[in-house]
Regions:
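Structural/interface elements that position substrates and couple domains in central-metabolism enzymes
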Residues: 1-246
Length: 246
């Protein structure tokens, strides 16, 4: 792309955008996009690794991150059941593949972050099994209700949602998986999962309810109080005997 092309593209964007249009060459612009999403992937992986460590030591990772982020030069993102969408799970893969293919060595931070984030659904399954075992219930044959199966809150986009491997692994271990998501009428990625329409009744009946995505429409406290057991992977539920956090 020539400098003249860049100037004209910038002029076009300024017609309908209020933000600053910064011009650079196409290779740097592409690398910038990959870098942004890879950095977020690494940051989320750090938060997820922290959540594993804190769970083993009885530390509230959400409080820990909130306190650490009071430092003006610290900005740790939030842990969760995995990463999703068409950017964070994809761009770091593209970047690390090209580094290996063209330069002959690994992009170690990015590859480790991908490994950590990819294991989170399996970790959630293991924690779910532990919670049920505490109630003298096996995972096999238990009903697990997933709340929110999109990749981020308040949208219908399911691309690369961590809810997919989470549900698939629960089913593989013999659990009956149900889901509730007002944004998703037909969860084609996991056809074995049963969609429920009566949220309150489903939460009350399920052996374990897992908050996977925190849509604004969810009254988390009411749902947690109704549930037999409530596994909060987003750190939003208040403490109670029924609630277990990631």
């Amino acid at each position: 792309m020539t400098p003249k092309c860049s100037e004209r593209a910038s002029a076009l964007y300024k017609i309908f955008l209020e933000g600053e249009c910064v011009i650079t060459n196409s290779r740097t612009a592409e690398m910038c996009k990959l870098t942004e999403n890879s950095f977020r992937d690494v940051n989320i992986a750090f938060a997820n690794e922290l959540s594993l460590i804190c769970a083993e030591q009885g530390i509230n990772v959400w409080e820990l991150i909130r306190l650490a982020n009071r430092h003006p030069r610290v900005n740790i993102l939030q842990p969760g059941p995995g990463v999703g969408g068409h950017c964070i799970p994809i761009d770091p893969n593209y970047l690390s593949y090209n580094v290996r293919a063209k330069l002959g060595y690994p992009f170690r931070f990015v590859e480790l972050a991908q490994e950590i984030n990819a294991t989170m659904p399996a970790y959630v399954v293991q924690r779910a099994q532990n919670i049920l075992n505490e109630d003298s219930k096996p995972l096999r044959g238990s009903t697990v209700l997933l709340l929110g199966v999109t990749y981020k809150p308040d949208i219908a986009d399911q691309r690369e949602s961590p809810a997919v491997p989470l549900a698939q692994q629960l089913i593989a271990k013999g659990a009956t998986v149900q889901y509730f998501d007002a944004k998703v009428a037909d969860w084609r990625a996991v056809p074995e999962a049963e969609r429920v329409d009566d949220l309150d009744a489903a939460v009350a009946a399920a052996d374990l309810t897992v908050l996977v995505q925190n849509h604004k429409s969810f009254d988390v406290e009411a749902l947690a109080s109704t549930a037999q057991r409530f596994f909060d992977t987003r750190g939003v539920a208040e403490d109670s005997d029924k609630v277990e956090r990631l």
